[in-house]
């Protein structure tokens, strides 16, 4: 007996790990948030630039996040001309290529902002995605620390434009040269120690995640993720001695951080005080340069009302020696924006968001293409992370914007209904014709309109058509009727308001009145 042919298996619909779909509500919230960021960046004189998602892999270079070799940490493929191309892992490396390629045509300093998706070929985990959004601003061709100070001020202004009050965020600033100077003092200067220096930087960069004793393991022989030997993955450390590790931990100590002033301005230390404390951690030219640059930044911040002083206890930007940033290409001042808000997620669990943006000076990135010094500094906001925070604190809505006005259909002749839709659209009203099964009942079409979050629906049966009128059903008010069932008089009154008729030539005006009454506006 012949075997029965097997049914072909259905393809399983599934999303790759570390990626996420987004719906209308989230997209609308992103759009609102991005517009506010854009307004601040443009107020500072930055202009938009777009670069492709793909770059030649060698243009991205060795500056890959948490990796020491090209092609690791990025998604790459070989083109038909046998050249390797990769999805961008941030928006800074592509900008460096863009500026280098168009160097003679661009004004210097070149000031631009960019917004888009970036991609990381890393192990995904909770809150760690392989694709996420960033919004960057960069100044290329400005050699002084004034450009870095401006980035910090702009970061503070952006947080406040997004509805985060002073005291609920802080912009933290440091200088890579300060830590480099400390590393030189313990014998880790020179190119031959570049790998160990980077391991130290990445260990200190995890200070917000791990306790000091865990950081010390990363500075020493290494750390097991499981908490004890043999458990979990092993991260090799920088192999520093205990004395060397102690000096590094002391130089990046939170006790140096400016601020902690009383309401009357007493107590606390200023940013300038912090710089002077840092000068005492080592005695070499590298550390001196770093502290001199931080002093310039501190003076500018104080002059503009952003710094930590006794006259300005409401601190917006502080010098914090624990900030190092994990990317290798930073060469000078580095900065980070941290949210100080404690909130709860949808399940009532406490959430502390921490860093939502950062950046720094990268004087060597454009220079790779030019063979000459090209100073640059930039700031990047993690849009996805910041959006999650703003949604939880109520500064961004998590509801979709109103859907279109739905024109329902009766019978096979749809030309008249399509004309209604066209009339509404010409008046600037979002509208659509119900294009589902033409045999669907009015009730089924209303269910569709509800799912579309429509503010109202247009109904015209054969009787209304003969009279030249339409019925307008207020779906927002209709949804509220259930809460009025105990108050019969009010219920009947609102029920009458929830559906009314008008002449066809009055339809647009009546819909506009309803939308205004319900506060419906499409962004």
Curated annotation (Swiss-Prot):
InterPro entries: aa-tRNA-synth_II, aa-tRNA-synth_II/BPL/LPL, Anticodon-bd, Anticodon-bd_dom_sf, His-tRNA-ligase, HisRS-like_core, HisRS/HisZ
Record family assignment: Belongs to the class-II aminoacyl-tRNA synthetase family.
Membrane-spanning ranges: none
Primary residence: cytoplasm
Subunit comment: Homodimer.
Keywords: Aminoacyl-tRNA synthetase, ATP-binding, Cytoplasm, Ligase, Nucleotide-binding, Protein biosynthesis
GO-annotated cellular components: cytoplasm
UniProt-listed Enzyme Commission number(s): 6.1.1.21
Name this protein carries in UniProt: Histidine--tRNA ligase
Gene3D superfamilies the record matches: Anticodon-binding domain (3.40.50.800), Bira Bifunctional Protein, Domain 2 (3.30.930.10)
Catalytic activity reported: tRNA(His) + L-histidine + ATP = L-histidyl-tRNA(His) + AMP + diphosphate + H(+)
Enzyme class, broadest EC rank: ligase
BP GO annotations: histidyl-tRNA aminoacylation
GO MF entries: ATP binding; histidine-tRNA ligase activity
UniProt subcellular location: Cytoplasm
């Amino acid at each position: 007996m012949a075997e029965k042919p097997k049914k072909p298996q259905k393809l399983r619909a599934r999303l790759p790990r570390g990626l996420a779909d987004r719906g209308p509500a989230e997209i609308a919230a992103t759009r609102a948030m991005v517009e506010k960021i854009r307004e601040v960046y443009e107020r500072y004189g930055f202009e938009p630039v777009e670069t492709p998602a793909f770059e030649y892999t060698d243009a991205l270079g060795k500056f890959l996040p948490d990796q020491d070799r090209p092609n690791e940490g990025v998604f790459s493929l070989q083109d038909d001309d046998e050249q390797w191309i990769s999805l961008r892992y941030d928006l800074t490396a592509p900008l460096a290529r863009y500026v280098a390629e168009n160097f003679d045509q661009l004004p210097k300093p070149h000031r631009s902002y960019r917004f888009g998706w970036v991609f990381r070929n890393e192990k995904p985990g909770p809150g760690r995605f392989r694709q996420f959004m960033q919004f960057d601003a960069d100044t290329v061709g400005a050699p002084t620390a004034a450009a870095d100070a401006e980035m910090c001020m702009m970061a503070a202004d952006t947080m406040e434009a997004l509805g985060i009050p002073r005291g609920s965020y802080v912009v933290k600033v440091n200088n890579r040269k300060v830590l480099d100077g400390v590393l030189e003092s313990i014998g880790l200067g020179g190119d031959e120690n570049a790998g160990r220096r980077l391991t130290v930087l990445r260990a200190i960069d995890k200070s917000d995640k791990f306790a000091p004793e865990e950081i010390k393991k990363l500075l020493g022989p290494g750390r097991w993720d499981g908490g004890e030997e043999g458990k979990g993955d092993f991260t090799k450390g920088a192999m520093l001695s205990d004395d060397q590790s102690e000096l590094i931990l002391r130089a990046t100590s939170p006790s140096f951080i400016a601020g902690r002033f009383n309401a009357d301005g007493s107590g606390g230390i200023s940013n300038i005080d912090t710089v002077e404390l840092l000068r005492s951690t080592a005695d070499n030219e590298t550390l001196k340069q770093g502290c001199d640059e931080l002093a310039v930044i501190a003076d500018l911040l104080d002059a503009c009302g952003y710094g930590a002083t006794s006259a300005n206890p409401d601190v917006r930007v502080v010098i914090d020696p624990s900030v190092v940033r994990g990317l290798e290409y930073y060469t000078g001042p580095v900065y980070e924006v941290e949210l100080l808000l404690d909130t709860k997620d949808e399940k009532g669990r406490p959430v502390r968001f921490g860093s939502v943006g950062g950046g720094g000076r990268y004087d060597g990135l454009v220079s790779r293409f030019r063979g000459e010094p090209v100073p640059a500094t930039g700031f990047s906001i993690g849009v996805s992370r910041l959006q999650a925070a703003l949604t939880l604190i109520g500064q961004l809505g998590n509801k979709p914007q109103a859907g279109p006005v739905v024109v329902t259909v009766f019978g096979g002749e749809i030309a008249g209904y399509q004309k209604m839709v066209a009339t509404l659209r010409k008046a600037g009203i979002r509208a659509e014709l119900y294009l589902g099964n033409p045999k669907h009942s009015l009730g089924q079409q209303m269910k569709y309109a509800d799912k579309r979050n429509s503010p109202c629906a247009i109904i015209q049966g054969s009787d209304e058509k003969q009279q030249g009128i339409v019925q307008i059903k207020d779906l927002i008010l209709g949804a509220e009727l259930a809460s009025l069932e105990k108050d019969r008089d009010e219920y009947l009154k609102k029920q009458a308001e929830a559906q009314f008729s008008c002449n066809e030539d009055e339809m647009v005006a009546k819909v506009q009145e309803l939308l205004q009454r319900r506060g419906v506006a499409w962004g």
